[in-house]
C-alpha cells in the first residue's frame, strides 16, 4: 500500500496485481486493479487487421504492443474486456489525482502521468523513455511505455517511439475522429484529446483494455 501526498491531502494508492491469458493467442498480460477498475498493465499485442508493430518490426511488438487504428481498437480486446471510454480514463486519472480536471482542454492532470510511467531512461540504459522522463515513479504499476504512433500516410509513417504514449478511447467526437490520452517524456501529466485536438481514426495508437 502506498500513500501519495497531494497539496496537503493524503491519497492512498493500492495497486493489486494479477495476470490474465488471452485465449485467442495464449499471450499472458499483467493486470492491475486501481480503485474499482481493473486494467491491463501492458499494451495489447493481439494481431488484427489494421494493427502494426512499430516500423513493422515484430521485435517492437514484444516490448510496446501493437498500434491499432480506432476501428481495430474497438474490437481488439478479449472477451470480458473492452476499449475504455473517455469517462473510464477520467475515472482512473481522478483516482490518481483528485485535482484532475476531466473537462479541461488538453492537460487533464499535471501529476498522474508520472505515477503511471515506467522509470528510467534510454540514455542511461535503465528504461524505455527518452530523458528526462519527468516525474516517472510507476507507483501505480500501470507501467506506461512510450510506443509512439503510426501516421496514416500512404506507406505508413512511425513517430515518437521513446517519447510519447498514445492510447485510444472508445469515445467518438466526430465521424472520423475519436478521443485519446497522451503521456510524454517531458511532462508528468496526462493530456486529453478533445473535439478540437483529436486524431483521425486512421492513426495507429496503443490500446489498454479495461475489464467489463
Locate each region found by the language model.
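Sec-dependent signal peptide recognition
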Residues: 1-2
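C-terminal motif of bacterial Sec signal peptides marking the signal peptidase cleavage site
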Residues: 6-8
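Conserved positions within compact, well-structured domain cores
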Residues: 11-212
Amino acid at each position: 500500500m502506498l500513500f501519495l501526498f497531494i497539496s496537503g491531502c493524503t491519497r492512498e494508492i493500492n495497486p493489486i496485481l494479477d495476470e490474465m491469458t488471452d485465449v485467442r493467442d495464449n499471450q499472458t498480460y499483467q493486470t492491475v486493479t486501481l480503485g474499482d477498475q481493473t486494467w491491463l498493465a501492458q499494451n495489447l499485442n493481439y494481431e488484427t487487421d489494421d494493427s502494426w508493430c512499430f516500423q513493422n518490426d515484430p521485435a517492437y511488438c514484444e516490448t510496446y504492443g501493437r498500434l491499432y487504428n480506432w476501428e481495430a481498437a474497438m474490437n481488439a480486446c478479449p472477451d470480458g474486456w473492452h476499449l475504455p471510454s473517455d469517462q473510464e480514463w477520467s475515472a482512473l486519472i481522478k483516482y490518481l489525482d483528485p485535482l484532475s480536471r476531466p473537462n479541461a482542454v488538453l492537460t487533464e492532470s499535471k501529476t498522474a502521468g508520472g505515477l503511471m510511467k515506467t522509470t528510467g531512461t534510454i540514455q542511461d540504459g535503465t528504461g524505455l523513455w527518452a530523458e528526462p522522463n519527468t516525474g516517472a515513479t510507476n507507483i501505480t504499476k500501470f507501467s506506461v511505455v512510450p510506443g509512439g504512433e503510426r501516421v496514416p500516410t500512404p506507406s505508413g509513417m512511425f513517430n515518437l517511439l521513446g517519447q510519447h504514449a498514445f492510447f485510444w478511447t472508445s469515445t467518438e467526437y466526430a465521424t472520423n475522429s475519436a478521443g485519446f490520452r497522451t503521456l510524454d517524456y517531458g511532462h508528468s501529466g496526462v493530456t486529453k484529446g478533445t473535439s478540437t485536438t483529436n486524431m483521425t481514426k486512421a492513426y495507429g495508437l496503443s490500446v489498454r483494455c479495461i475489464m467489463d
